[in-house]
């Protein structure tokens, strides 16, 4: 289940807001310019589905976003716990950074934790299957896929180079807890 926790940036162990309610999550994130939606597949996605099958299942929503936002590239990323590069991939996203384009991800399966630093607040957003998140360009954030990552996500890009992070050099991401998916154990 999706979850939003909001912290003051100096109190990483004490959220002042916690919700698993879709309408509350959407409303809180909208205040800082983040889009958060739930999508439903038009056809079943089977384990081992190809990227083409994944995109076909969500074609109407993908086309709507492309038309609305002018995305030039769409792809599918799939990470499993046995991926030999999982630690390297996790480390790449764990430091606070921003992009010069919106970061838009739709979770087809699995989960991950986006954490946004906006003003003096930190928004921890657990994204799960059927969640779409769009983080505006210039927004400082980090992403944690967990130590045993499992997710399949559709990624949208306006830049042909794909993912390009501009790191802030701050240590804020290190001060906040790491992601442990619900059901594994409590991360916080």
Swiss-Prot record:
InterPro entries registered for this protein in UniProt: ARD, ARD_bac, RmlC-like_jellyroll, RmlC_Cupin_sf
Biological process, per Gene Ontology: L-methionine salvage from methylthioadenosine; L-methionine salvage from S-adenosylmethionine
Cofactor or coenzyme needed: Fe(2+); Ni(2+)
Broad EC category: oxidoreductase
Cited Pfam families: ARD (PF03079)
Known pathway: Amino-acid biosynthesis; L-methionine biosynthesis via salvage pathway; L-methionine from S-methyl-5-thio-alpha-D-ribose 1-phosphate: step 5/6
Key words of the record: Amino-acid biosynthesis, Dioxygenase, Iron, Metal-binding, Methionine biosynthesis, Nickel, Oxidoreductase
Cofactor mode of binding and number, as noted: Binds 1 Fe(2+) cation per monomer.
Site entry (Important to generate the dianion), positions: 105
Molecular function as annotated in GO: acireductone dioxygenase (Ni2+-requiring) activity; acireductone dioxygenase [iron(II)-requiring] activity; iron ion binding; nickel cation binding
EC number: 1.13.11.54, 1.13.11.53
UniProt binding sites for Fe(2+): 97, 99, 103, 141
Reactions it catalyzes: 1,2-dihydroxy-5-(methylsulfanyl)pent-1-en-3-one + O2 = 3-(methylsulfanyl)propanoate + CO + formate + 2 H(+); 1,2-dihydroxy-5-(methylsulfanyl)pent-1-en-3-one + O2 = 4-methylsulfanyl-2-oxobutanoate + formate + 2 H(+)
Residues under site feature: May play a role in transmitting local conformational changes: 102
Residues annotated for Ni(2+) binding in this entry: 97, 99, 103, 141
Chain positions of site May play a role in metal incorporation in vivo: 96
Protein function: Catalyzes 2 different reactions between oxygen and the acireductone 1,2-dihydroxy-3-keto-5-methylthiopentene (DHK-MTPene) depending upon the metal bound in the active site. Fe-containing acireductone dioxygenase (Fe-ARD) produces formate and 2-keto-4-methylthiobutyrate (KMTB), the alpha-ketoacid precursor of methionine in the methionine recycle pathway. Ni-containing acireductone dioxygenase (Ni-ARD) produces methylthiopropionate, carbon monoxide and formate, and does not lie on the methionine recycle pathway.
Subunit structure: Monomer.
HAMAP family: Salvage_MtnD
UniProt similarity note: Belongs to the acireductone dioxygenase (ARD) family.
Official protein name in the record: Acireductone dioxygenase
